[in-house]
Amino acid sequence: MKSILSFLIDAKRCEIAELKRLAQTSGLVDGIGGLVHALQRERGLSNLYLASGGSRSLEALMAQHRLTDQLVQLSAQTFEGLDVEAHPAAHGARLFARVALAAQGLSVLDALRQRVLACAENTVRTSAAYARLIDALLAVVFEAADSAADPAISRLLVALFNFSQGKELAGQERAAGSALFAAGQAQAEAQQRLMRLIDSQERCFLVFAEFSGESLRARWRDLQAVEGVAKLEHLRRVLLSTPPAQPLDVEASQSWFDACTQRLDAMRGIEVELTAELQARCRERLRAANDDLRGLQTRLARGEASLGADAFEFFADTVGGSVPPVQASAGAVGPQLERSVHELVHAQAQQLQAMSAELEAVRASLQERKLIERAKGVLMAHRQLSEEDAHSTLRRLAMDQGKRLVEVAEALLAMAPMLPTEPR
């Protein structure tokens, strides 16, 4: 049989392969963030253009098309550079399915643009089309967050996904408000949608704050205090408090767009910082893992392949099923050449146990989101509801029953086979 150190070396090599995959994924996530930001701006300008009947924002929209196209090309190159062999079978299947859907959406983007330029679409359908494309791109980020095996990296990915999701909802708010102002008249349905978008993005930012570091939380708090956000809050009140069918200032559409854009650009800065922290963490963990590997290989070369006098220590301290503790001064596994092979084995076991517990907590957030999304899908299929209406229905049920949203989602999924389908 191979020596114990040989197995530890194999484990470390697997860890390094996983960290390399995460480093590649973090680069993909960075590129997607830039493309999504460009598409969000393109959507807002498209709504300004459509709501004005083609009389406003054409030059800015065409310039944005060119900028977005550059980022589409970069993302396409990143997609093509993904290494299938580097991804475990189950995760790879999901990731590449997500990438395929996103690539399909990008391939028909020009067709959507042509309909917008011809004023053959309205603002609602256009916003929904861009939202589907952006959701497909963010799903790639979600898949990355759902597959990370390192707790610290997983936490950053969860924070990033929720922040990006909140930013997308803020982008939808920009587009919806631009169209509402440009239409020149308050509309009850559009006002209700704005309120839902504002509420939903705040929930995403709460999750971001839970999983991000203090420096990023401070940046987020500082963003709430800038002058542009105060102006945005004022324009929000105008949009939401104007009675339906009453006039709105058409000229305020540009002010609204600019205020939202200032906020979204600042949010993009936080997103970039979060992505940079993610990439730095990947590099840091990769360096540490390589150091560990070299340390283990050195010990193996020195012939430290057996437990020697420490052999019986495997059974020590096992009253109650506890694992023998490792001294706090042990530090990282690899470079500590004075430690026994026995300690190395238990250090590896203890590290894996701690990682497993922390990952369980991090992934609970992702699992809740999956359940809620599935429950929304059930409502959309059985009640013929839009995604927003399905989410509102779940929230109303949760409030009425005094339960958490995920508890209502679980109950609904359990009853799904018995739900009748309403005719279209």
Which residues fall in each region the model found?
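Proline-rich intrinsically disordered, low-complexity coils
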Residues: 88, 244-247, 324-325, 335, ...
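Recognition helices and adjacent regulatory flanks at domain boundaries
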Residues: 345-403, 407-424
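Membrane topogenic helices and adjacent juxtamembrane segments
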Residues: 302-369
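Generic structural signal for short, flexible, solvent-exposed coil/loop and linker residues
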Residues: 11-17, 21, 39, 152, ...
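Hydrophobic alpha-helical segments
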Residues: 1-315, 369
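Short secondary-structure transition/capping segments
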Residues: 262, 322-325, 333, 404-409
